[in-house]
Swiss-Prot record:
Belongs to the cytochrome b family. It is a multi-pass membrane protein. Gene3D superfamilies: Cytochrome Bc1 Complex, Chain C. The chain crosses the membrane at residues 33-53, 77-98, 113-133, 178-198, 226-246, 288-308, 320-340, 347-367. The keyword Hydrolase does not apply. Pfam families: Cytochrom_B_C, Cytochrome_B. This is Cytochrome b. It comes from Myotis formosus (Hodgson's bat). Its cofactor is heme b. Heme b b562 binds at residues 83, 182.
Length: 379
């Protein structure tokens, strides 16, 4: 008699995805982030659901409802800070997951990669709308500035912005619809994650060598379930340290001031995980040019498979490409720092140089250095 997990229509899917799934024997801890992202998503949906039970999406009461939650609801502050810092952990895992894909050439699985890019955009949109909900100063002005960027689109821009706002400024209608979308999108993300996994399981996982591992596979359970639990414990430890010791470290103090359309904060900036894109946006003096660069800074990932000129898939044995990769990482950290600084010299010029370097590394230098490496290996 076959095991129920192998014969039951529903359990069979779970079994083939998480238990008997053949996985390469050599995948390192860089492959842990997929499961960590799944846990982050589940945590965000769970904490978000309980937060939504206490939140009111009305400009008059939104700020007070969040304050009430933190002061008067049992462990409400834990829920709130788990959700806020959980988003930070989500993005740390996301960026490491994408970085792993770039380093080891996982983008050659184009379907999985493209769904991943759509997921990244969706998660970013969800996080942006979530930041607006507490209706503090940075929430209001962040929403105003970022939605206003759409007005740079020729001809339809102004109408589009007013349509998104539901009026002539960010107001009650905007807050209500942002709450509706912020609640809905994580469930759409969950469905897209399943599609992401579906495409991944069509090809199987990549591995650090970049060489097909069909001849050397091991079952996902117990080997990688145990390995994933270790990663999970480390992530939960970091998250709890953030939540319990310095819950506001990654937030903005301006968001503890209720939204006031009549007073602009001295430095409007998004959450830390958007600062690199914000720096690229600000580095171009033209509004439309800035918006295009902002979108391209993420969308450029979609052409990675086309820019792959190396005869090897992974960067594991390509020291020159490795140097460029870590230069790209350093450049992104520089952009993140610049995004949080005021618009004045020397920050303006540093931001512009870092933005040029970002696009140059990906579009020009990486494909060129790969060709050089091919030549050095006489391929």
């Amino acid at each position: 008699m076959t095991n129920i997990r192998k014969s039951h229509p529903l359990l069979k899917i779970i079994n083939n995805s998480f238990i008997d799934l053949p996985a390469p024997s050599s995948i390192s801890s860089w492959w842990n982030f997929g499961s960590l992202l799944g846990i982050c998503l589940a945590l965000q949906i769970l904490t978000g659901l309980f937060l939504a039970m206490h939140y009111t999406s009305d400009t008059a009461t939104a700020f007070s409802s969040v304050t009430h939650l933190c002061r008067d609801v049992n462990y409400g502050w834990v829920l709130r800070y788990l959700h806020a810092n959980g988003a930070s952990m989500f993005f740390i895992c996301l960026y490491l997951h994408v970085g792993r894909g770039l380093y080891y050439g996982s983008y050659m699985y184009t379907e999985t990669w493209n769904i991943g890019i759509i997921l990244l955009f969706t998660v970013m949109a969800t996080a942006f709308m979530g930041y607006v909900l507490p209706w503090g100063q940075m929430s209001f002005w962040g929403a105003t500035v970022i939605t206003n960027l759409l007005s740079a689109i020729p001809y339809i821009g102004t109408n589009l912005v007013e349509w998104i706002w539901g009026g002539f400024s960010v107001d009650k209608a905007t807050l209500t619809r942002f709450f509706a979308f912020h609640f809905l999108l994580p469930f759409i993300i969950s469905a897209m994650v399943m599609v992401h996994l579906l495409f991944l399981h069509e090809t199987g996982s990549n591995n650090p060598t970049g060489i097909p591992s069909n001849t050397d596979m091991i079952p996902f359970h117990p080997y990688y379930t145990i390995k994933d639990i270790l990663g999970l414990l480390l992530m939960i430890m970091v998250l709890l340290m953030l939540v319990l010791f310095s819950p506001d470290m990654l937030g903005d103090p301006d968001n503890y001031t209720p939204a006031n359309p009549l007073s602009t904060p001295p430095h409007i900036k998004p959450e830390w995980y958007f600062l690199f894109a914000y720096a690229i946006l600000r580095s171009i003096p033209n509004k439309l040019g800035g918006v295009v660069a902002l979108v391209l800074s993420i969308l450029i990932l979609a052409i990675m498979p086309l820019l792959h000129t190396s005869k090897q898939r992974s960067m594991a044995f390509r020291p020159l490409s490795q140097c460029l990769f870590w230069l790209l990482v350093a450049d992104l950290l520089t952009l993140t720092w610049i995004g949080g600084q005021p618009v004045e010299n020397p920050y303006i010029i540093i931001g512009q140089l870092a933005s040029i370097l970002y696009f140059s590394i990906i579009i020009i230098l990486m494909p060129l250095i790969s060709l050089v490496e091919n030549h050095l290996l006489k391929w």
